[in-house]
Amino acid sequence: MSPIIQSAWGIVYHMSSDWEPRYLLIKRHALSGKIERVAPKGKIQGNEDIQKTALREVSEETGIPINQMRIKQQLGTTQLRNTENQKGQMDKDVTYFLMEYAGNPDFVKIEHAEGYIGIHKRCTLNEVLALIYYQDIRELIRKSYSIIKDGQKNMDIKKDFINKLG
């Protein structure tokens, strides 16, 4: 059995002017040769912790400075196991993080490395759900959307409460 690789993905969003989250996806060539959309991701290097891996990989793959991103929370983990010994497949434990980007999405750029060929900067929830091939990733996107919207509701409740006190 091959070693299990630890990796981290960043489900990255920024808030649009209409207060709806917009997601960042990367386009790449899949092993099948088709173009797929994925979240920025990568492997742990050295003694790096999983959150630092997520921030570093998103920064490396999109050009977003680490200081313009904030991990909101861990969304979940999956175990990917290669039971058929397919070429290019490896055993991985993947940790997913919801990350907020506070900068201008116009400045996000793709690095033409690791097979990446482009970027989608402003995907709505429905666009992401239509573009993402993998069901488990679509579920994480749905979960992230609920977390973001619940956070907005909580902020509105706090503002209303403070206004009533004043």
Locate each region found by the language model.
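Unchanged
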Residues: 43-139
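A generic secondary-structure boundary signal that marks alpha-helix termini
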Residues: 19, 63-64, 150-153
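A short, polar/proline- and glycine-enriched secondary-structure boundary/capping micro-motif
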Residues: 34-38, 118-119, 142
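Charged phosphate-binding loop/patch that engages nucleotide di/tri-phosphates or the phosphate backbone
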Residues: 132-166
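Residue-level marker of positions within ordered structural domains that often coincide
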Residues: 15, 102, 146
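A periodicity- and composition-biased signal for non-globular, repetitive helical segments
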Residues: 33-34, 47, 144, 148
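Functional cleft and adjacent loop/helix regions within the main domain
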Residues: 36, 40, 46, 84-86, ...
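N-terminal strand-loop-strand
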Residues: 1-40
